Swiss-Prot record:
Name this polypeptide is given: ATP-dependent RNA helicase sub2
Organism listed in the record: Aspergillus fumigatus (strain ATCC MYA-4609 / CBS 101355 / FGSC A1100 / Af293)
EC number: 3.6.4.13
Gene: sub2
Enzyme class of the recorded protein, top EC level: hydrolase
Domain (Helicase ATP-binding) ranges: 89-271
Keywords tagged on the record: ATP-binding, Helicase, Hydrolase, mRNA processing, mRNA splicing, mRNA transport, Nucleotide-binding, Nucleus, RNA-binding, Spliceosome, Transport
Main location as per UniProt: nucleus
Composition skew (Low complexity), residue ranges: 19-29
Amino acid sequence: MSHEEDLIDYSDEELQTTDAAATTAAPAANGAQDKKGDLTVSGGRPDKKGSYVGIHSTGFRDFLLKGELLRAITDCGFEHPSEVQQVCIPTAILNVDVLCQAKSGLGKTAVFVLTTLHQLEPVPGECSVLVMCHTRELAYQIKNEYARFSKYLPDVKTAVFYGGTPIQKDIEVLSNKESYPNIVVGTPGRLNALVREKKLSLRNVKAFVLDECDKMLDQIGKQAQIAHMRRDVQEIFRATPADKQVMMFSATLSQEIRPICKKFMRNPLEVYVDDDTKLTLHGLQQYYIKLSESEKNRKLNELLDSLEFNQVIIFVKSTLRANELDKLLRECNFPSIAVHSGVSQEERIKRYKEFKEFNKRICVATDVFGRGIDIERINLAINYDLPADADSYLHRVGRAGRFGTKGLSISFVSSEEDEKVLKEIEKRFEVALPEYPEGGVDSSTYMA
């Protein structure tokens, strides 16, 4: 079987999904429950002595992390951990499994990056940490987070593997003991291909992490590519030792997906947002505009001309629409780029870096950028095409207003289907989205 037959392109979320299961926090069958602000916390392995729920830290030093990690954290300018970091890290560093749902932009990635780096004792030629996510861009971003926090840990080697690039390059990295990574980040299709070919050994894995876990494990009512992804995750999981730490994270975890996640775990610490309304993003102003399909381009042009913003991400539902809209914007002298699965992997990473490094201020994207991508200067998100469900909406608009900062989102509503989704969003999050005011919005209310 060729390598390419194993590589399914999961990274574009353009096929519209139809279900958006309600997400409400339920206490675990085992363990007490503790409310901390927006979070519901429960569980933790019973074989561990004491209770770690409710540990509150005012600074990262209180976590007793390695000195090298604290230096890197200081270099990044971080002073105080977010609430999800306060709740998760003290328990996670004790090797307890973690299932965490927290809204976008609150530092979930740092939970597993800092935890695994703190626990890691690198052995040359051995992979100890395996992190999987559903898109190549997110994998690339996570790898960069590991690089950022391991800058004072010179013996730690990290590599990222995903489809769309020659697999031979990955094999070369894994064939050299000097470059063999202690931490592997990647997408399930490519990782499973490397495991099947016996190029990547997982027999020494001590930490198994899924970021945006619901996207990889939920196959009920979803497109076939999600089912393939779940199959790959299961095969990879079986290739790892039974005794390991498992951590899973997402901004949305429905009641249906939680039991599936927990099948991979042993008595995990469970951290959930109290209820769906808490999933809305504080500091992010959200509006909609009713208009016809033919009016979208003119209205978008008006918004980009009139609104102040640092960077804007514009979501569309297909690669074709992304290309056409990007072309139109550039013809109107807007500094735009497009990111979607139709672009080669090398070019996608190049464009991602251009946008991340503020060389471009406008990005037209499909849902490939809808989850997990953290670009701190984005403070405006526009749904040129409304997504198919409330969960996708939350992930999209969460690109603006990261880590509790201010932001603005505007959604175009142009069809009966859009109106149904809008009502679903309002019902799900118990919020009435206002119509965008004719006079516009005061920039001081969403510009940091």
